[in-house]
């Protein structure tokens, strides 16, 4: 038996103060009444569903880990192929850019683009950076740490390698 979970009354009555999913990065997946009429949220059916209850990995949020031995970035890019991704290091920043042209999906035509920029710790060995894309669409960018930082005043492209196994990133 399917039971729809109603959101708490205090979240429904906040109206325009409660974030809409209208500008989420999941374009083409359809909108709910709340997305178009947030000021009427308390009068709309209490059985609508909001995007804030999606899983972390489904939301495209990245995870950055920096421990004593290495620096790692996990980024969900399941809608992109390795050819759609560009990863480069410029000065002490890593820039990840993804773009695919318009293509058809279940809801019509869609094109996507994102740009993420992360500061590299000064003690990351920039000559040993690597980047891979798992079969489930998790991009993993990593680099070992060294005792003293290298001079990071140049730009260098980092190739994206495809892995056949799913990512080992946590699903939070």
Swiss-Prot record:
InterPro entries: A-crystallin/Hsp20_dom, Alpha-crystallin/HSP_16, Alpha-crystallin/sHSP_animal, Alpha-crystallin_N, HSP20-like_chaperone. The keyword Nucleus applies. Residues 1-63 are annotated as: Required for complex formation with BFSP1 and BFSP2. CDD domains: ACD_alphaA-crystallin_HspB4. GO terms for biological process: actin filament organization; apoptotic process involved in morphogenesis; embryonic camera-type eye morphogenesis; lens development in camera-type eye; lens fiber cell morphogenesis; microtubule-based process; mitochondrion organization; negative regulation of apoptotic process. The modification Deamidated asparagine is found at residues 101, 123. Residues 52-163 form the sHSP domain. It comes from the Eukaryota. The modification Deamidated glutamine is found at residues 6, 50, 90, 147. Pfam families: Crystallin, HSP20. One of its GO terms (cellular component) is nucleoplasm. Its main location: cytoplasm. Keywords: Acetylation, Chaperone, Cytoplasm, Eye lens protein, Glycoprotein, Metal-binding, Methylation, Nucleus, Phosphoprotein, Zinc. Zn(2+) 1 binds at residues 100, 102. The modification N-acetylmethionine is found at residue 1. GO terms for molecular function: identical protein binding; metal ion binding; structural constituent of eye lens; unfolded protein binding. Zn(2+) 2 binds at residue 107. Acetylation at Lys-70 may increase chaperone activity. Undergoes age-dependent proteolytical cleavage at the C-terminus. The modification N6-acetyllysine is found at residues 70, 99. The modification Phosphoserine is found at residues 45, 122. Contributes to the transparency and refractive index of the lens. Acts as a chaperone, preventing aggregation of various proteins under a wide range of stress conditions. Required for the correct formation of lens intermediate filaments as part of a complex composed of BFSP1, BFSP2 and CRYAA. Heteromer composed of three CRYAA and one CRYAB subunits. Inter-subunit bridging via zinc ions enhances stability, which is crucial as there is no protein turn over in the lens. Can also form homodimers and homotetramers (dimers of dimers) which serve as the building blocks of homooligomers. Within homooligomers, the zinc-binding motif is created from residues of 3 different molecules. His-100 and Glu-102 from one molecule are ligands of the zinc ion, and His-107 and His-154 residues from additional molecules complete the site with tetrahedral coordination geometry. Belongs to the small heat shock protein (HSP20) family. This is Alpha-crystallin A chain. The gene is CRYAA.
């Amino acid at each position: 038996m399917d039971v729809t979970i109603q959101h708490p009354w205090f979240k429904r009555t906040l109206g325009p103060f409660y974030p809409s999913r209208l500008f989420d990065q999941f374009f083409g997946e359809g909108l709910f009444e709340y997305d178009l009429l947030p000021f009427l949220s308390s009068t709309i059916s209490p059985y609508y569903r909001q995007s804030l209850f999606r899983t972390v990995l489904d939301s495209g949020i990245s995870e950055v880990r920096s421990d004593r031995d290495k620096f790692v970035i996990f980024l969900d890019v399941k809608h992109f192929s390795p050819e759609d991704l560009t990863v480069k290091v410029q000065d002490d920043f890593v820039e990840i850019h993804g773009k695919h042209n318009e293509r058809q999906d279940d809801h019509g035509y869609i094109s996507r683009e994102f740009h993420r920029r992360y500061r590299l710790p000064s003690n990351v060995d920039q000559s040993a950076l690597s980047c891979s894309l798992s079969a489930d669409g998790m991009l993993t960018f990593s680099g070992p740490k060294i005792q003293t930082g290298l001079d990071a005043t140049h730009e260098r492209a980092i190739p994206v390698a495809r892995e056949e196994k799913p990512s080992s990133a946590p699903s939070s």
